């Protein structure tokens, strides 16, 4: 099992950055893992697989908080949260996320 997860990690295009970021408009959504392609959101009320979501949050970058706005879809739903794949995002937000992950990883 550990070998399988290492293999999955090595195939990822981006590392997952563990971080606590609150999602605007959703009181109990907290981003736990984040990269430019998606995130894992901790919540007591995860949405079902294939549900579409609109996300707005901020990331600390270059001594300020920068906004991120993205559309996504739930790819995995678990009792403690859900994995989101970003499906639509302006290029500038994608660039912010790439830089954010590079800074902290």
Per-range role (PLM):
Residues 31, 72-74:
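Conserved hydrophobic positions within beta-strands
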Residues 36, 77-82:
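Short, conserved beta-turn/loop elements at beta-strand boundaries and strand-helix junctions
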Residues 2-4, 13, 81-105:
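C-terminal output/interaction extensions
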Residues 50-52:
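Loop/turn positions that initiate beta-strands
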Residues 1-36, 44, 102-105:
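N-terminal helix initiation/capping motif
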Residues 24-26, 64-70:
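Short coil-to-beta-strand transition motifs
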Residues 59-63:
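Short, charged beta-turn/beta-strand-edge "cap" motif at the junction between a beta-strand
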Residues 42-48:
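Short, surface-exposed secondary-structure edge patches
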């Amino acid at each position: 099992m550990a070998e399988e997860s290492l293999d999955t990690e090595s195939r990822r295009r981006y590392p997952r950055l563990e971080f606590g970021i609150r999602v605007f408009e959703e009181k109990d959504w907290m981003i736990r893992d984040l990269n430019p392609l998606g995130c894992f959101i901790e919540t007591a009320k995860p949405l079902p697989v294939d549900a579409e979501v609109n996300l707005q949050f901020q990331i600390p970058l270059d001594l300020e908080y920068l906004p991120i706005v993205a559309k996504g879809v739930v790819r995995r739903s678990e009792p403690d949260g859900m994995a989101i794949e970003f499906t639509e995002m302006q290029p500038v937000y994608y660039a912010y996320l790439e830089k954010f992950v590079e800074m902290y990883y």
